Amino acid sequence: MSLHELIKQTMSKNLEKKHYELLKLKLGEDHPLSVRQQIHALNQNLVSENLEQSQIITSLTKMLKDQKLQLKAQRKNAAQLECVDLDDILDTAAEVKSVTDNIKETLLAGLESD
């Protein structure tokens, strides 16, 4: 079902309702043609509502599938982050600090000797 079909059905529903209103005005509410048209208009209304609800359900289903894929990707990222070893990170940070301190001492020693 496409948006085009939904618009087409809504227009049909509106035309059937207008036709019923015209027959009711010209022939009276109790005339057999008016009653028949009223039933037809109500049927069109139900069909239109069913199409609208189907469109909403389809949209919601697509949105939920997209969210499910996003959550799956986020879980994968979280699992990868959990695998990172905190001890390795702390060891690397200590090594960087040690190298930085050595460079600093070398620079200060070079400046003091001048």
From Swiss-Prot:
Record-stated family: Belongs to the herpesviridae UL96 family.
Name recorded for this polypeptide: Protein U68
Species assigned in the record: Human herpesvirus 7 (strain JI)
Annotated gene: U68
